[in-house]
From Swiss-Prot:
<feature type="binding site">
    <location>
        <position position="207"/>
    </location>
    <ligand>
        <name>S-adenosyl-L-methionine</name>
    </ligand>
</feature>
<comment type="pathway">
    <text>Protein modification; peptidyl-diphthamide biosynthesis.</text>
</comment>
<dbReference type="GO" id="GO:0004164">
    <property type="term" value="F:diphthine synthase activity"/>
</dbReference>
<comment type="function">
    <text>S-adenosyl-L-methionine-dependent methyltransferase that catalyzes the trimethylation of the amino group of the modified target histidine residue in translation elongation factor 2 (EF-2), to form an intermediate called diphthine. The three successive methylation reactions represent the second step of diphthamide biosynthesis.</text>
</comment>
<dbReference type="GO" id="GO:0017183">
    <property type="term" value="P:protein histidyl modification to diphthamide"/>
</dbReference>
<dbReference type="InterPro" id="IPR014776">
    <property type="entry name" value="4pyrrole_Mease_sub2"/>
</dbReference>
<feature type="binding site">
    <location>
        <position position="9"/>
    </location>
    <ligand>
        <name>S-adenosyl-L-methionine</name>
    </ligand>
</feature>
<feature type="binding site">
    <location>
        <position position="164"/>
    </location>
    <ligand>
        <name>S-adenosyl-L-methionine</name>
    </ligand>
</feature>
<dbReference type="GO" id="GO:0032259">
    <property type="term" value="P:methylation"/>
</dbReference>
<dbReference type="InterPro" id="IPR014777">
    <property type="entry name" value="4pyrrole_Mease_sub1"/>
</dbReference>
<dbReference type="InterPro" id="IPR004551">
    <property type="entry name" value="Dphthn_synthase"/>
</dbReference>
<feature type="binding site">
    <location>
        <position position="88"/>
    </location>
    <ligand>
        <name>S-adenosyl-L-methionine</name>
    </ligand>
</feature>
<comment type="similarity">
    <text>Belongs to the diphthine synthase family.</text>
</comment>
<feature type="binding site">
    <location>
        <begin position="113"/>
        <end position="114"/>
    </location>
    <ligand>
        <name>S-adenosyl-L-methionine</name>
    </ligand>
</feature>
<keyword id="KW-0489">Methyltransferase</keyword>
<keyword id="KW-0949">S-adenosyl-L-methionine</keyword>
<comment type="subunit">
    <text>Homodimer.</text>
</comment>
Length: 255
């Protein structure tokens, strides 16, 4: 059996009772934290909560050694943990699919993720369009996909959730400031009037914690603001309902 379980967004207290129940029964627990990470806790605290040791896999081991993990699940009960929800990343979906192809029972235990946590903004979830990711620019690699996604969503009046790059192995987490700067840099190159310093944006920091940060304002005012510790995400609002306008006014710190 393969149990795919999410750990939630922030710390070990997000772990569900169902995950705790299965953790007691399984033979071995694996985890990965390169697609998302719990910034409010440590691996030791998670292990203490689950009362079992956890083998942490890096990106290469997850992407290239999944067959080994799946083979183990033929004869043993294996738990695979991720931050957030276990089925958000395509890599995790692939693991579940491959396991089912081999006739292995797969149990999926959902958990809070950024997709549920953005409800804290008061923006209507059905008005979000395609999600995009802003990554750290590298030599000869600076994808403009986020710009195109925002452009397409705005045409339809949709909000855009921008996830920010995580390089957990380097303990490098993109800030909202860096994400907004990247969007402006792409605009300067493309010059299609999609994003500017006058564009309004929302920043969510430390979603899932007891003290998340919610900030709203023009990009030119947000870009140098200190949003505190990560993780951050950015939302470019589309057409706003009057209730959403009230949410941005009263639930957010307006910069």
């Amino acid at each position: 059996m393969l149990v795919m379980a999410g750990l939630g967004l922030y710390d070990e207290r997000d772990v569900t009772l169902k995950t705790l129940d299965f953790a007691k029964k399984v033979d071995k627990i694996y985890a990965e934290f390169y697609t998302a990470i719990l910034t409010g806790t440590t691996m030791e605290k998670v292990e203490e909560t689950l009362q079992k040791p956890i083998t942490v896999l890096d990106r290469e081991k997850v992407e290239y050694e999944t067959n080994k993990l799946i083979e183990e699940a033929k004869d043993k009960d294996i738990m695979f943990l991720t931050a957030g929800d276990p089925m958000v990343a395509t890599t995790h979906v692939d693991i579940a699919v491959e396991a089912r192809k081999k006739g292995i029972e797969v149990v999926i235990i959902n958990a809070p993720s950024i997709y549920s946590a953005i409800g804290i903004t008061g923006l209507q979830l059905y008005k979000f369009g395609k999600t995009t990711s802003i990554v750290f620019p590298e030599p000869n690699y600076f994808p403009e996909t986020p710009y195109d996604v925002i452009k397409d969503n705005l045409k339809l009046g949709y909000h855009t959730l921008c996830l920010l790059d995580i390089q957990a192995d380097k303990e490098r987490f993109m800030t909202a400031n860096e994400g907004l700067s990247a969007l402006l840099e792409i605009e300067e190159k493309r010059n299609e009037n999609v994003i500017s310093g006058e564009t309004h944006a929302a920043v969510v920091a430390r979603a899932g914690s007891t003290k998340p940060g919610l900030y709203y304002g023009k990009i030119k005012d947000l870009i140098n603001y200190d949003f505190g510790t990560p993780l951050h995400c950015v939302i470019i609002p589309g057409k706003l309902h009057f209730m959403e306008e009230d949410a941005l006014k009263y639930l957010f710190e307006n910069i």
